[in-house]
Swiss-Prot record:
Signal peptide: none
Taxonomic lineage of the native organism: Eukaryota, Metazoa, Chordata, Craniata, Vertebrata
Record key words, sorted: Coiled coil, Cytoplasm, Cytoskeleton, Microtubule
Family to which the UniProt record says this protein belongs: Belongs to the MAP7 family.
Ranges in coiled-coil conformation: 71-131
Annotated GO biological process: microtubule cytoskeleton organization
Protein name: Ensconsin
Chain residue ranges for the region called Disordered: 1-73, 86-163, 261-539, 575-631
Localization of this protein: Cytoplasm, Perinuclear region; Cytoplasm, Cytoskeleton
Organism: Gallus gallus (Chicken)
Role: Microtubule-stabilizing protein that may play an important role during reorganization of microtubules during polarization and differentiation of epithelial cells.
Length: 725
């Protein structure tokens, strides 16, 4: 009996342990089934896709707004640039117009200044011509006295006879006396010729005129025959000499005044004008001294006068040879006539009135020509010409000193004069036809000289006009060249600025295009990354879904396998019950009642996913406090891990364990309930979720009063527990 009690106690302990394990499994199954509906993963993927789509739409809207802002900014920049270009073009146009107006004003001022200079020059020339053409109130008498010499002026060499300068080596001493003043005049004219350059044509004319003519020799011989005494040829009183000197001094003052006026007009030729005035002054003094020496009333004073002058006249052939080498302006080959040659008695006749305007006209032309020569050709003198002029001036000064000292000198020795020629004494006067012919010859020579001077003047004026035109043309060309250079420079500057602006614009557009491409590339990369992320999320969601489906299929397969195993177990259990039912009814006949009233075994298993399913076992016990039967409900869930699947017992072993000896009628069963301060979770919760009645923790003696043992119930309980485990 003790052995049977120990065996039943071991079975109860194992049943309690199995119930604990089943409670834990049921609790874990409930926790798993309770957390599944809270977080559905498929709905989360849809929400993520929807949120991603919303974010993408929002980003597209932001990009569109940003692109609109960029386009507006570019439009404003383009409008600002165009406005800046318009303002710049307008400023350049205004500057160009101002420059053209300024240039036109400067050109107008320059033209007015040229006009004023031209008018002033014309006025000066006109005043000079008027002053030169003003008639001089002088006595023009043809006499043997000093009045004849009063109309002869240093500034009018054209009225002198040209043929009287053709001095040759005559032997007549009377001719030497008469030609003393002519030699002095020739010395003065040679001084001018040294300073003035002669053309070859003019030099040939001068050489031809230097040869003496037959009429001159005949007139000289006739005059010498008429005048027995040299003193009677010039009955000049000291008073007339003084008058002549005063008149010549007045003429010299006028000449110096006109020369000073010309010098004031030409300030840049002041040095040349000064030299010219000095030379004219020396020549005037020399001529005046010669005149004074020739017309002196002392016969002794007139005799030695030709000696120093005759030395100069003897050097005339060499002087004529050197005229071609003098560097002076052309147009001045005027050979003055004799200054103090008294006419022959046959030539004494009144002066014609028509010669005076002609002489005045020649004088005016001569002064105008002299002014032009001083203005245009004064700067062309060379150092050689200056040296020769200085030598000539020294010679003139020496001759003047000799003339001044001549009254106190003794008469010159006759060896100094040329050998005397045979005197031809002829009575009577010179033929009037010869005098007329000589006068016409003089007029013809004067006319030719005047025409030649007029032609030279026209040539000089033409040359000056050409020079002025060339100068104005050069000035205009230079101005045009400067304007063209300025225009080219401005054009190059404008092109450079336009190129810089175009380059800046292209650079700005290129930077904008690069920035736009960079932003588009970044946006495309971001969109690509977003698409890749979405694809990765979709793949992950698909993988999770497939894993869940596989997991569900595996669980379903496991559930079906467990169901099959349970069905097999239940089949074996029914067979065992069918075998053991008949002996139990025979031995304990009252057990069937108890089973019908207080105990029911439900073996219909439920699926493991249902929380309320599972076989239930109702065991009737008696409460120790009240003695009333208490119903205990045990829920057994067939969901167990695969590691517990190997704990199934063999049917034979189960038969041995459940098979009890029915020989012993006196059997008591002790049920071991779980011992602890806290009941199991399966016992604490029933199907409705409410607390079950309290279970006593102390062991209960079954059937204590009646002493009846229920082996069938115990065997079923133990067998069921073993099979489930």
């Amino acid at each position: 009996m003790a052995e049977a009690a120990g065996r039943s106690g071991g079975r109860r302990r194992r049943a309690a342990e199995g119930s604990k394990t089943q409670d834990k499994k049921v609790a874990s199954g409930q926790s798993n089934t309770g957390t599944k509906p809270d977080h559905p993963p498929i709905l989360k993927v849809d929400d993520r896709q929807r949120l991603a789509r919303e974010r993408r739409e929002e980003r597209e809207k932001q990009l569109a707004a940003r692109e609109t802002v960029w386009l507006e900014r570019e439009e404003r920049a383009r409008q600002h640039y165009e406005k800046h270009l318009e303002e710049r073009k307008k400023k350049l146009e205004e500057q160009r117009l101002k420059e053209e107006g300024r240039r036109a004003a400067v050109e107008e001022k320059r033209r007015q200044r040229i006009e004023e200079d031209k008018e002033r020059h014309e006025a000066v020339v006109r005043r000079t011509i008027e002053r030169s053409q003003k008639p001089k109130q002088k006595q023009n008498r043809w006499s043997w006295g000093g009045a004849l010499h009063s109309r002869i002026n240093n500034s009018d060499p054209d009225r002198r006879s040209v043929s009287t300068m053709n001095l040759s080596k005559h032997v007549d001493p009377v001719i030497n006396k008469r030609l003393s003043s002519s030699s002095a005049t020739l010395l003065n004219s040679s001084d001018r010729a040294r300073r003035l350059q002669l053309s070859p044509w003019e030099s040939s004319i001068v050489s031809r005129l230097l040869t003496p003519t037959h009429s001159f020799l005949a007139r000289s011989k006739s005059t010498a025959a008429l005048s027995g005494d040299a003193a009677s040829c010039s009955p000049i009183s000291p008073l007339s000499y003084k008058t002549m000197s005063c008149r010549n001094s007045a003429d010299r003052a006028k000449l110096f005044a006109s020369t000073d006026a010309v010098g004031r007009r030409r300030t840049h030729l002041a040095g040349t004008d000064k030299k010219e005035k000095e030379r004219d002054h020396l020549s005037s003094n020399f001529s005046a001294n010669l005149k004074g020496g020739h017309f002196s009333s002392n016969p002794k004073a007139r005799s030695p006068a030709p000696s120093p002058v005759w030395h100069a006249s003897k050097s005339l052939p060499s002087l004529a040879g050197t005229l071609k080498q003098i560097t002076s302006p052309p147009g001045s080959s005027k050979v003055p006539s004799t200054q103090a040659r008294p006419p022959s008695p046959g030539n004494i006749r009144p002066v014609k009135k028509d010669t005076k305007p002609e002489n005045e006209k020649k004088r005016a032309e001569k002064e105008a020509e002299k002014a032009n020569e001083e203005r245009t050709e004064g700067s062309k003198e060379t150092s050689a010409g200056t040296g020769e002029s200085a030598n000539q001036e020294e010679l003139a000064v020496q001759a003047e000193d000799a003339q001044a000292a001549s009254p106190s000198l003794p008469p010159a020795p006759p060896a100094l004069s040329p050998p005397p020629a045979p005197m031809k004494t002829s009575a009577g006067t010179t033929d009037p036809e010869e005098a007329t012919r000589l006068l016409s010859e003089k007029r013809r020579l004067a006319r030719e000289q005047r025409e030649r001077e007029e032609q030279e003047r026209r040539e000089r004026e033409e040359l000056e006009r050409q020079k002025k035109e060339e100068l104005s043309q050069r000035i205009a060309e230079e101005r045009a060249r400067r304007e063209e250079e300025e225009a080219r420079r401005q054009e190059a500057e404008r092109k450079r600025k336009d190129a810089e602006e175009e380059r800046e614009k292209e650079e700005r557009l290129r930077r904008q295009a690069e920035e736009r491409e960079q932003k588009e590339r970044e946006e495309m990369e971001r969109i690509q990354k977003q698409k890749e992320e979405e694809a990765r999320l979709r793949e992950e969601a698909e993988r999770i879904r497939l894993e869940r489906e596989k997991h569900f299929q595996r669980e379903e397969q496991e559930r079906l396998e467990r169901k099959k195993r349970l069905e097999e177990i239940m089949k074996r259990t029914r067979r065992v019950e069918a075998v053991d039912k008949k002996p139990n009814d025979q031995q304990n006949g009252h057990i069937s009642k108890a089973n019908n009233t207080g105990e029911a075994v439900i073996t219909s298993p439920a699926p493991p996913m249902e929380p309320s399913g599972g076989p239930q076992l109702q065991h009737a016990t008696q409460s120790p406090h009240s003695g009333k039967p208490v119903t205990c409900t045990h829920t057994i869930v067939s969901h167990q891990p695969p590691m517990n699947m190997d704990s199934n017992l063999n049917p034979e072993k189960n038969t041995e364990e459940n098979g009890m000896s029915m020989q012993n009628d006196n059997f008591e069963e002790i049920i071991n309930l779980p011992i602890g301060s806290k009941p199991s979770r399966l016992d604490a919760l029933n199907n409705d979720g409410s607390d079950s009645p309290g279970i006593p923790l102390n062991p209960i003696l079954a059937f204590e009063d009646k002493g009846t043992l229920l082996p069938q119930v115990d065997s079923v309980q133990t067998h069921q527990t073993a099979e489930v485990i």
